Swiss-Prot record:
It is found in: Golgi apparatus membrane. The lineage of its organism: Eukaryota, Metazoa, Porifera, Demospongiae, Heteroscleromorpha. It comes from the Eukaryota. The keyword Transport applies. GO terms for cellular component: Golgi membrane. The keyword Protease does not apply. Keywords: Golgi apparatus, GTP-binding, Lipoprotein, Membrane, Nucleotide-binding, Prenylation, Protein transport, Transport. This is Ras-related protein Rab-21. Belongs to the small GTPase superfamily. Rab family.
Amino acid sequence: MASPSDASRRRQATVKAKVVLLGEGAVGKTSLVLRYSENKFNDKHEQTLQASFVEKRLNIGGKRIQLAIWDTAGQERYHALGPIYYRDSQGAIIVYDITDEDSFHKARNWIKELKRMLGDKVTLCIVGNKIDLDRQRTVSEKDALEYAESVGAKHYYTSAKQSKGVAELFLDLAKRILEANPPSSSTPPESQRGAPSSHPPSQPRQRSTLIVTDDSEQPSPKQGGGCCS
């Protein structure tokens, strides 16, 4: 029979999950991470070089999860580095720009590569970003939803500029990862894969490392700002 202290340790066990953002350059991956982690928006486009990451801790229904969120470079010259960063990921967010049909088609290539590397073990999100530019949309909602369903992914719409759907995206992903990787007595606390300390051989350029402890499962209030998505 488990002692009260054993039960307490199980309750406090933290699932660590590695989440990787993939997509072409300028679709808004870095803006999504910045909005989620710091509730900020930078109207100046800055290219991500190789990769950077932030951390986020959540408490969802008494279950603790720590997300190591990896923001990867979308420029073609960095594509070969992709597998280094998304191996051992529990979650993947593939981002496209709803005003750029080519970014949607290329998102399919990222998903094919993910499936080849990770199979169906990864919790998959497809994100149409820049929903604030809906009048300039070139990717139909029907095509996006049908494709997401065909690959076993959930589809989301976001606007980093207006803070629409961003907190909800990461919260839902965290819930899905917890469902797929529930904490158990056989899993030591703070020991799941995806910890930021497990850096790939090539060290990432860190934009910042932010730890926010024990966020509730309620999304943060929406805030706008900036001039780009």
